[in-house]
């Protein structure tokens, strides 16, 4: 039996040049990662390499789909509903689409550029194989075809730096203006919701492996050496993706504790430094505290736990999303929620999609998560009977932002599937009454009516007493949605019900209302009222989308828990802007998610100096599509306005006035407060946290010069 290489050995197949690269770039393709896995006795690298070669051969023979189709469930049909078109995957860029929309007779590529790039790379691979004396294969493999050649560090740190077209900073630009979650949590003794509560975020089903007392190797920031050195730290506290760490040797001294996001590449399992020839150096502050650091670490590490060896690999795997720029879909029309519009995916960040309406302007966009019930595949509206705004033919489409971005339609199985419904034994009928979350004011649960029954279990619901009489405020809910409830739900759960116009909340009675309107309530058995053990508790902190301005993600608190329904309060804002969301909503995220994905996080609102603004300028502010403008709570601290502020929101009159006159008196000055913007899906199978491989040979004693 062949002896596995020890941590000091370097496999002979690896060229020496590999060691001269930046060792902090943990994953630089499977070749550079082979020595890491083999050194710890893991066969995952060789398995990945062998399986990758086997998959390539099978793909060439037409037996396996390209990687994006691995996201499909085993029972996924091979044809699209209603159209009969088969799904296809571009062999160059990996984009998923339909065969009829793909290029060439073979339908192997999504565009001419991909076809040419594939051909060029195939020739290079064939020439390289001949130079190396390898036998020719039936089809030369494409060089650098997949995104796996990207470094894991670059992937986690900079998923597109700079700004989006709407001015939203991303990547490193977002992190520079980031909100300090650690200080905020520690100063106020807040508790963050665990990552395991959010089923749509990376590694949600493996976060139980991250526990208090766990040991990791992190960058030593308290050292004066020319090269980057590391030291071992213990997890003192967990808060979402962030952990509070303490260097070994400080023991009970918390003065040098620091927060870190476990998604960064400077946090590693124990043994990583020994494998990668990195030096362990104690912090300069305590370097003289012990004379035998090796013995001290041996005692501290024995029996402890650390991160799984493949932690960062699985993190990257779980942050790959099937939606790509250029995919077309149907999304709710934000100007008229009773219909949908055609849109094109412009940006994908952490599973969140920035959509551009096809017939809109360059800033006519809409943000949502890829699991949002607001988006659907092309043809969905026609199939279920939902209204859709037909795109107008524009003569200047060459200058439209979606021009040259439309590659293919997003296939149906990329969208979150809804629960199957059975209409036998009675179903929803037009005119039935129920309670529903108001889509235009998400903090209210209102008396509502089923206005129309669509196909596939979808319903058009309207709020009783709404301002619209033409049906423009109808909203589409699926029968299994957790945003609709049977009559008396609010009464049974002590939630304030918003009655129709002309009724008082204190005196509203369902029996009298049904009798007066000569209607009947929808049977309770038709509603989806199951409640999982979600783990959310009152007071937990998280990051939540402001659904009235869905491009913004804000610091928020779980204000109330009613079964699976959560009342989300945005820190610093008045309670009238609270929102009801489901515990499995894709619009809530754990602490540190924005930092992990490079998305901008809105901090709690603080007082800012009033900015004089001419009345006529104030009236030009873009009107919000949904809901009311936010009224600010008088804060105790002040903070200067940061450069990242965009789209200021007008503050309401603190005495209760909600509207600003469109024709202000000459000479009046309107004070404007600006809402600050600060930058800061299923996962692989769960792996148990391994015992520590105690290896502390490379410990260097640092001395003061």
From Swiss-Prot:
Q: Which InterPro entries match?
A: Mbt, MBT_L3MBTL2_rpt1, MBT_L3MBTL2_rpt2, PcG_chromatin_remod_factors, Znf_FCS, Znf_FCS_sf
A GO molecular-function term, please? chromatin binding
The answer to whether the entry has keyword Transcription regulation is yes
Q: Does Zinc-finger count among this protein's keywords?
A: yes
Q: Which domain of life is it from?
A: Eukaryota
Q: A Pfam family for this UniProt protein?
A: zf-FCS_1
Zinc fingers (FCS-type): give the ranges: 81-116
**Which GO BP terms apply?**
negative regulation of DNA-templated transcription
| Compositionally biased tracts (Acidic residues) | 15-25, 50-60
Q: Where is this cross-link: Glycyl lysine isopeptide (Lys-Gly) (interchain with G-Cter in SUMO1)?
A: 700
> Where are the residues linked by the Glycyl lysine isopeptide (Lys-Gly) (interchain with G-Cter in SUMO2) cross-link?
405, 647, 659, 675, 700
Where is the PTM Phosphoserine found along the chain? Answer: 13, 67, 338, 683, 688-689
Q: Where in the cell is it found?
A: Nucleus
Q: Segment Disordered: which positions?
A: 1-84, 608-705
Q: Which CDD domains match?
A: MBT_dSfmbt-like_rpt4, MBT_L3MBTL2_rpt1, MBT_L3MBTL2_rpt2, MBT_L3MBTL2_rpt3
Q: Where is the composition biased (Basic residues)?
A: 619-634
Low complexity: compositionally biased ranges: 38-49
Per the record, its GO cellular-component terms are: nucleus
**What interactions and quaternary structure are annotated?**
Part of the E2F6.com-1 complex in G0 phase composed of E2F6, MGA, MAX, TFDP1, CBX3, BAT8, EUHMTASE1, RING1, RNF2, MBLR, BAT8 and YAF2.
Q: What name is this protein filed under? A: Lethal(3)malignant brain tumor-like protein 2
Q: Which organism is it from?
A: Pongo abelii (Sumatran orangutan)
Q: Which gene encodes it?
A: L3MBTL2
């Amino acid at each position: 039996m062949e002896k596995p290489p020890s941590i000091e050995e370097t496999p002979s197949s690896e060229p020496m040049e590999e060691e001269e690269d930046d060792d902090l770039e943990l994953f630089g393709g499977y070749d550079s990662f082979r020595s890491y896995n083999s050194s710890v006795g893991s066969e995952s690298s060789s398995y990945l390499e062998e399986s990758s070669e086997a998959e390539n051969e099978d793909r060439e023979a037409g037996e396996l789909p390209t990687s994006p189709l691995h996201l499909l469930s085993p029972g996924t049909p091979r044809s699209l509903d209603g159209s009969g078109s088969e799904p296809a995957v571009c062999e160059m860029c990996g984009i998923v689409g339909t065969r009829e929309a793909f290029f060439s007779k073979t339908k192997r590529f999504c565009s001419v550029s991909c076809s040419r790039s594939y051909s060029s790379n195939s020739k290079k691979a064939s020439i390289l194989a001949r130079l190396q004396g390898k036998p020719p294969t039936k089809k030369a493999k494409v060089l650098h075809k997949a995104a796996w050649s990207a470094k894991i560090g670059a992937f986690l740190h900079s998923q597109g730096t700079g700004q989006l077209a709407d001015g939203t900073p991303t990547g490193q630009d977002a992190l520079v203006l980031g909100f300090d979650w650690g200080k905020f949590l520690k100063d106020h003794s807040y508790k963050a919701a665990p990552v395991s509560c959010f089923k749509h975020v990376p590694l949600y089903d493996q976060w139980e492996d991250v526990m208090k007392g766990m040991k990791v190797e992190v960058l030593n920031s308290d050292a004066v050496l020319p090269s980057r050195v590391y030291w071992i730290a213990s997890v003192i506290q967990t808060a979402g993706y962030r952990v509070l760490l303490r260097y070994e040797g400080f023991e009970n001294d918390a003065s040098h504790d620091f927060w870190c996001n476990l998604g960064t590449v400077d946090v590693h399992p124990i043994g990583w430094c020994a494998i990668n020839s990195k030096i362990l150096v104690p912090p300069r502050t305590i370097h003289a505290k012990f004379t035998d650091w090796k013995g001290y670490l041996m005692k501290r590490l024995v029996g402890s736990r650390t991160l799984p060896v493949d932690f960062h690999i699985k993190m990257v795997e779980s942050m790959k999303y099937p939606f790509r720029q250029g995919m077309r879909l149907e999304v709710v029309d934000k100007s008229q929620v009773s219909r949908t519009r055609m849109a094109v995916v412009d940006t994908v960040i952490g599973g969140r999609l920035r959509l551009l309406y096809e017939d809109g302007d360059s800033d006519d966009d809409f943000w949502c998560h890829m699991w949002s019930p607001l988006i659907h595949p092309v043809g969905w509206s026609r199939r279920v009977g939902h209204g859709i705004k037909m795109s107008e033919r524009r003569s200047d489409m060459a200058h439209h932002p979606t021009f040259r971005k439309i590659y293919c339609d997003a296939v149906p199985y990329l969208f979150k599937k809804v629960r199957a419904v059975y209409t036998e034994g009675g179903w929803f009928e037009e005119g039935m009454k129920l309670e529903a979350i108001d889509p235009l004011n998400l903090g209210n649960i209102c008396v509502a009516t089923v206005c129309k029954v669509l196909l596939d279990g979808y319903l058009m619901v309207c709020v009783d007493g709404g301002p619209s009489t033409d049906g423009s405020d109808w909203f589409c809910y699926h029968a299994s949605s957790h945003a609709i409830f049977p009559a008396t739900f609010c009464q049974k759960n002590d939630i304030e019900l918003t009655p129709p116009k002309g009724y008082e909340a204190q005196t509203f009675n369902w029996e009298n209302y049904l009798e007066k309107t000569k209607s009947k309530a929808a049977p309770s058995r038709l509603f989806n009222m199951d409640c999982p053990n979600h783990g959310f508790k009152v007071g937990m902190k998280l990051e939540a989308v402001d659904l009235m301005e869905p491009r913004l993600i804000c610091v928020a608190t779980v204000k109330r828990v009613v079964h699976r329904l959560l009342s989300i309060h945005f820190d610093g804002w008045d309670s009238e802007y609270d929102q009801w969301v489901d515990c499995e909503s894709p619009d809530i995220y754990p602490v540190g998610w924005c930092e992990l994905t490079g998305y901008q996080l809105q901090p709690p609102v603080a007082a800012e100096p009033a900015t004089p603004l001419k009345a006529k300028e104030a009236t030009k502010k873009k009107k919000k599509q949904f809901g009311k403008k936010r009224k600010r709570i008088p804060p105790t601290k002040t903070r200067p306005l940061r450069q990242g502020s965009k789209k200021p929101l007008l503050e309401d009159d603190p005495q209760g006035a909600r509207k600003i006159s469109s024709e202000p008196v000459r000479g009046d000055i309107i004070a404007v407060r600006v809402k600050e913007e600060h930058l800061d899906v299923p996962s692989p199978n769960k792996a148990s946290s391994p015992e520590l491989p105690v290896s502390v040979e490379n410990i260097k004693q640092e001395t003061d010069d």
